[in-house]
């Protein structure tokens, strides 16, 4: 009777009325305290009996099913759910990567054709390939019981895209922000890897922000000369052990994954290492260079060291920058373009900055032991959209953050006011 009566709701009710030893505790992230909870002990429990069901109805004020469904929607993400979400986003990233690689292997040479222009960015044909893969994947793979709103460049001027299709945004449980291809120009010129970036957060409407992201995955789209594609993922509160790094050989149809080791540098200074402030475009180069010069002068220049051996690497993808910090390649990377362009009063350069979808995998860096914050040290709390400018600084470890942060603040204040 019990098994017949409640199979569809069994898993959800266990979180509410399951084992007495199932404790819930808040989880903090560098993006601020996030309103998520981890299920610290999950063990088999029996199916809910009729008495327990009626008790639940009493809690809901006898308003089944509408109130019960609302309660089901508001149940916080536990560890099992987080891991499931991780696997789903890893599958999504692999799907987009494979679609782009397959199209490239056909010998197509029109990746650089402009397909459209949005407030967030210019959309190229290669972006449309990835977007088609996204929609197909969500139709086929995303759990029907997890209604989700999608946010990615190309649809910001359209009504909210949700899955299952047609679900009102107000009825969704999650918000998934995606950068289908971070580094489109890298792929167009076959210059450097691009990345598929995705982050999942509990739905809070327009209040959902970067600090709410609970699962993040980044998947490498390699150049035509490169056989290996890395994929990194993390869940909130998992720490370094919860960061999963794998690689596949994209030359063969069988995508066999193998673990790889990705560790941030343990350096305590930037000498003889890589550290950069972003300046991809002519706009703002002079101001950014002044800030950087003052920074290194204060930290490292002296009579005994008239030349400062700190190198820079202008990787034009935010995903690639984060990967550099996580993989031990870089000590510090800062993207202060929104501050510089504001000083220049250059409104037309608004699209030439980092946006939330670019930095949505910052959780992987912080769970790896790195630091990600605003230039003034605040947590990143920009809304999960495709147009809000984001200024950020990433450090490979806490020691580097403590050394560089005060000097960087002073340099920014002296140059930009």
Model-inferred region functions:
Residues 89, 93-96, 100, 167, ...:
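An extended, acidic
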Residues 169-237:
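DPxDG-like acidic metal-binding loop motif
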Residues 13, 20, 31, 36, ...:
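Short, low-complexity intrinsically disordered segments enriched in A/P/G/S/L with frequent Arg
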Residues 4-9, 13, 47, 53-56:
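Aromatic (phenylalanine/tyrosine) cluster motif
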């Amino acid at each position: 009777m019990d098994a017949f009566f409640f199979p569809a709701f069994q898993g959800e009710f266990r979180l509410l009325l399951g084992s007495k030893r199932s404790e819930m505790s808040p989880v903090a992230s560098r993006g601020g305290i996030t309103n998520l909870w981890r299920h610290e002990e999950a063990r088999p429990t029996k199916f809910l009996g009729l008495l327990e069901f009626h008790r639940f109805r009493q809690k809901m004020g006898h308003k089944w099913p509408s109130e019960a469904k609302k309660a089901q929607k508001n149940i916080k993400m536990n560890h099992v759910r987080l891991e499931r979400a991780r696997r789903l986003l890893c599958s999504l990233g692999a799907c987009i990567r494979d679609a782009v690689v397959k199209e490239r292997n056909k010998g197509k040479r029109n990746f650089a054709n402009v397909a459209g222009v949005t407030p967030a960015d210019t959309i190229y044909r290669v972006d449309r390939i990835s977007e088609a893969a996204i929609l197909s994947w969500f139709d086929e793979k995303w759990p029907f019981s997890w209604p989700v709103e999608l946010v990615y460049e190309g649809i910001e001027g359209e009504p909210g895209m949700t899955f299952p299709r047609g679900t009102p945004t107000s009825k969704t449980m999650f918000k998934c922000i995606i950068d289908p291809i971070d580094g489109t120009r890298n792929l167009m010129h076959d210059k450097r890897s691009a990345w598929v970036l995705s982050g999942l957060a509990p739905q809070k409407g327009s209040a959902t922000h970067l600090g709410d992201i609970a699962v993040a995955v980044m998947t490498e789209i390699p150049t035509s000369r490169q056989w290996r594609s890395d994929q990194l993922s993390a869940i909130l509160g998992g720490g370094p052990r919860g960061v999963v790094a794998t690689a596949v050989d994209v030359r063969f149809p069988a995508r066999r994954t193998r673990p790889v080791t990705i560790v941030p540098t343990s350096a305590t200074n930037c000498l003889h290492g890589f550290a950069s402030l972003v300046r991809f475009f002519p706009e703002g180069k002079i101001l950014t260079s002044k800030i950087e010069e003052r920074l290194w002068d204060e930290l490292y220049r002296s009579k005994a060291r008239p030349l400062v051996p700190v190198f820079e690497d202008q990787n034009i993808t935010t995903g690639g920058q984060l990967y550099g910090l996580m993989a031990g390649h870089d000590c510090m990377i800062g993207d202060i373009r929104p501050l510089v362009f504001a000083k220049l009063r250059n409104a037309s350069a608004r699209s030439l900055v980092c946006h939330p979808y670019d930095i949505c995998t910052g959780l992987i860096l912080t769970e790896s032991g790195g630091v990600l914050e605003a230039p003034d040290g605040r947590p990143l709390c920009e809304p999960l959209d495709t147009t809000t400018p984001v200024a950020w600084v990433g450090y490979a470890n806490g020691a580097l953050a403590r050394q560089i942060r005060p000097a960087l603040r002073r340099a920014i204040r002296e140059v930009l006011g």
